[in-house]
């Protein structure tokens, strides 16, 4: 990622979270990774005083407490948060999850790959996209 801002990973599965962290290291992404296990915890981080806003949010959908769709509704309704790009990274095969995610203006919807090499390629494409994308100043 071009920015030095953190990446926020919202993922309840510790194995999947470690896989994302490992993939980011393997492709030499140096942004700090902030990991939260559900939407409520992620909102606490985003609203916390002194916490850097992330350059991107990697979001799972199937989580306890506040799931990914509920989290998206809250983030996209908040003027201070709605411009943060969100990429859904999920094992969900539900068509409605994809429809609802894009209705809430996600930047992308990526399936979690079972094969590690394919997963790293997915993370690499996310990184490349956000490295090449030009955001407005101050974003």
Language model segments and positions:
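Helix N-cap/capping motif at the beta->alpha junctions
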Residues: 35-48, 68
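Receiver (REC) domain active-site loop signature in two-component systems and cognate sites
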Residues: 63-66
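Alpha4 helix (beta4-alpha4-beta5 surface) of REC/receiver domains from two-component response regulators
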Residues: 22, 70, 93-110, 114, ...
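Active-site residues of response regulator receiver
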Residues: 59-60, 90
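Short amphipathic alpha-helix used as the core "switch/output" element in two-component signaling
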Residues: 25-26, 44, 69-82
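Conserved acidic segment of CheY-like receiver
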Residues: 5-25, 57
């Amino acid at each position: 990622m071009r920015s030095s801002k953190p990446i926020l990973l919202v993922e309840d599965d510790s194995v999947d979270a470690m896989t994302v962290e490992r993939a980011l290291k393997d492709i030499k992404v140096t942004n700090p990774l902030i990991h939260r296990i559900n939407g409520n915890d992620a909102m606490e981080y985003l609203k916390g005083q002194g916490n850097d806003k992330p350059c991107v949010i990697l979001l799972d959908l199937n989580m306890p407490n506040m799931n990914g769709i509920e989290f998206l509704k809250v983030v996209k309704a908040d003027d201070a948060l709605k411009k943060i790009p969100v990429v859904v990274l999920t094992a969900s095969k539900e068509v409605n999850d994809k429809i609802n995610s894009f209705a809430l203006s996600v930047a992308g919807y990526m399936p979690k790959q079972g094969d590690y090499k394919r997963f790293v390629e997915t993370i690499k494409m996310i990184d490349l996209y956000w490295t090449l994308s030009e955001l407005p100043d101050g974003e």
